Every structure is written in structure tokens, then in C-alpha cells.
Amino acid sequence: MEGTFKIIIADERHTVFAETISKEMESSAKQRGTGIAKRTPKYIQEKMLEGKAVVALTASDSWAGFCYVETWSHGKYVANSGLIVSPEFRKSGLARDIKKKVLELSTTKYPDAKLFGLTTGLAVMKINSDLGYEPVTYSELTDDEEFWKGCRSCVNFEILQSKDRKNCLCTAMLYDPKEKAEVTVNSETQEQKPKLGPSIKQVFSALFLLNL
């Protein structure tokens, strides 16, 4: 896949794709019959100019996929949002590669932040799970009002409101870099821990056999 597409951090050169990306996000949501918060071309351009977006390009430098980073609660939480792949390249594994790249971008720019996402797509849930995200309750997400305001343009916003923001049709998933680091350290410690010598019972058994 990496040989077919260039997956890079977006910049000013890629703002020309913003309108196409915005329209494709809306079109994709309508086709799936699921909700998605709308993102204007201007908003997408801002993310590109801030260095908070990843774009996938074909060999001819045409747009193939996109995803961006948002921060909430003063940088304590990061969301990788707006994952979209051009229709002709779907089911090719490109979405997984884009998510991997944007995860790397997020953990590099915000190493202490918790990463989260909300999605109704089974494919995205599978990708997130493979990358280390885990399903959580909405209470574990950011309480930043600006984040939840972004859900207003979703067709399911009334459901979210009626549930007092405790749940909705989206599945919440969380990636905590600190927890992942602790698990890695503990695993390495276990592997490096020297094996204990024979037990007392084994020693006595050996001595008994020698005296036979």
C-alpha cells in the first residue's frame, strides 16, 4: 500500500482538495445512512495549514484519502477525525494506513494526550481496535463543550441530547499512550526477569536420587 500511495502530513499545497474532501465526507455519510458532523472546506484547510492533517495521494498527486487531528480540554484529549477515502480506493487497506499515520502524528505532537474517537462504522472500529484503541463509555471522553457542539450537525444529535450525552449511536473508543507504555514496560520486565533456580523440592529430589 505504501508503494501505491504517498501518505504525508498535509500543508498549503493540499488545500485545493478541501472542497472535494468536504463534499465526499457528506456524501459518504448519506450513503451509509449514518450521522457525521459536517466539516466545511475552510475548516479542512485550517487543519492542513496547522499541520494537523494527513493526506493520501496517488502516484499522480491526486487526492485519495484524508484525516485530521483535533485537540480538546487544553490538549489533554486528541481526536483523529474525518477519516475519508476516495470511493475508488475503498476496501484497499488505505484507510488503515491513514489512521496509522495520523496516530503517529497525534502521539508525536501530543505525547501526553488521550486519543479518542466516535464512530458508527464497523470498519473504522476494527482499524481502531487493531491500532490499540479500546471501547469506552462516553463519560471517559472529553467534557469540552466545544467538542460536543461539533455533533450538532449530525443527524443523530437529538438522540445524543435525549441520552444526556451518556451514549448515542456512535461507539466511543480511547487510546491512552501512558497505559500502552506501561504495558510495554511490564511485558519487557517480565521477559527480562531472570529465571529462578530450582525449587527446594527439586534440590532434595536430586540429592535423594544421588544417594540411591
Predicted regions and their residues:
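Terminal substrate-recognition subdomain of acyl/acetyltransferases
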Residues: 1-3, 107-112, 116-212
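Short Gly/charged-rich anion-binding patches and loops
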Residues: 56, 101, 123
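Short amphipathic alpha-helical segments and helix-helix/interface helices
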Residues: 44-45, 103, 125
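Short beta->alpha linker loops
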Residues: 13, 39, 119-123
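A short beta-loop-alpha structural element at the N-terminal edge
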Residues: 2-20
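Conserved acetyl-CoA-binding loop-helix of GNAT-fold acetyltransferases
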Residues: 85, 91-106, 115-117
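A conserved beta-strand-loop-helix scaffold within acyl/acetyltransferase catalytic domains
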Residues: 22-88
